[in-house]
Amino acid sequence: MMGNQSSLRAYSQRQLRVGELVKQNLGELFIRNEAKIPSINSKLITVTEVRMTPDLKTARVYVIPLGGVDTKETVRILTEYSHLVRKALSKRLDIKFLPKLTFVEDN
């Protein structure tokens, strides 16, 4: 019984692969400031992890600013301007559905 519960929580290879692809591209996008997010220096943002939902339509993006300062504010700004991040990401990724991005502070 325990094996079934742990396998239900495990991520599929596809989720892991797409999550890693999104993570790499978001990292490059932030370094190059391609999203043009006002009031934030995206070069100072680190994407630590991306977790995809089973349908690959939503990505939970774990971020931390350099030095771990103002994490909540950084997440708030990224959430507010997530449409700009998605637009920039769409130019980099060739996948069927571009996931909705949910930004979360990494502890």
Spans of model-derived segments:
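Charge-rich, low-complexity N-terminal segments
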Residues: M1-T58, I64-N107
